[in-house]
UniProtKB/Swiss-Prot annotation:
It is an enzyme of class 3 (hydrolase). Mostly expressed in roots, and, to a lower extent, in flowers, leaves and stems. SMART domains: ZnMc. SUPFAM superfamilies: Metalloproteases ('zincins'), catalytic domain (SSF55486), PGBD-like (SSF47090). It comes from Arabidopsis thaliana. The conserved cysteine present in the cysteine-switch motif binds the catalytic zinc ion, thus inhibiting the enzyme. The dissociation of the cysteine from the zinc ion upon the activation-peptide release activates the enzyme. Its cofactor is Zn(2+). It comes from the Eukaryota. Its EC number is 3.4.24.-. This is Metalloendoproteinase 2-MMP. The gene is 2MMP. It is found in: Cell membrane. PROSITE patterns: CYSTEINE_SWITCH (PS00546), ZINC_PROTEASE (PS00142). Disruption phenotype: Growth inhibition, due to inhibited onset of shoots, reduced growth of roots, leaves and shoots, late flowering, fast degradation of chlorophyll in leaves and early senescence. Residues 1-20 form the signal peptide.
Amino acid sequence: MRFCVFGFLSLFLIVSPASAWFFPNSTAVPPSLRNTTRVFWDAFSNFTGCHHGQNVDGLYRIKKYFQRFGYIPETFSGNFTDDFDDILKAAVELYQTNFNLNVTGELDALTIQHIVIPRCGNPDVVNGTSLMHGGRRKTFEVNFSRTHLHAVKRYTLFPGEPRWPRNRRDLTYAFDPKNPLTEEVKSVFSRAFGRWSDVTALNFTLSESFSTSDITIGFYTGDHGDGEPFDGVLGTLAHAFSPPSGKFHLDADENWVVSGDLDSFLSVTAAVDLESVAVHEIGHLLGLGHSSVEESIMYPTITTGKRKVDLTNDDVEGIQYLYGANPNFNGTTSPPSTTKHQRDTGGFSAAWRIDGSSRSTIVSLLLSTVGLVLWFLP
């Protein structure tokens, strides 16, 4: 028996072993995924208006959020209560300062709206010192009875200013072999590395050896063994460790868009631009911390439906402080050249997943959308 497929294909799903969803552009994201919620984080909206002195059911969850990103030290690892206490008030004030919000110490609407935005999993505060303010030698000290609010907007570095040693300016990177990525996906990372090498004295080369590469990249779900578990769709998107660790992990549960077509992307609330996240996390791999400059690549959050890949002066100054300037850098950043093959997605939109498991609902949606007509011929 011959099996023939005839139909007008508008969408096509490719399923392969490993773990992540990729879409070539935002129009390939099915309607059912365009308004996916952030699950646990969206519930934080219930705390809008909470302030010091109140006891609100479930408020301990937002304390855990702040602890995850460093605003509450690990020393407060006991059972959190639902009291809006001094510890939470100090955390809220520091968060508001870091993100240039009105410092009220309350969970006002703007603060909650910002908290639920998808973000990098790296902390903003380490050992009581904010990484988002103060530049390379000025720190932003946190006292949990009083928050010092003086700060200077500037790029920041990890504590101790770790960086790749001078004899390692040609770095290799490799993908976890458990993630059989397509060339289109790999090219996204190549472009992201190129944005940093364009401005500084570093070179990046793709390697086939995951075990010996300087930088290792993988897509994982949930608890994947590094103490920084992922949380499903949206929420924390990725994290990377400071030099010379080289570990770069992305959440495989996200809906990753490989080619950012900004106009149509704006209406997609559950898809994330892969290159935008990759450029940010590479900054961490090279030694940059989070910046309070909202336009910078190293700003911790990125809204869905947004593409943000161009380095700002803040990013360039930070990376050149660590490694010096690329002698060919002319003072401006521009997108890497793109081949025609990378620009064109053909006459149809494709989505592919690297995972042995599959989202049956997505498969059925795709099949119903494409208008397939199946003919079985003897």
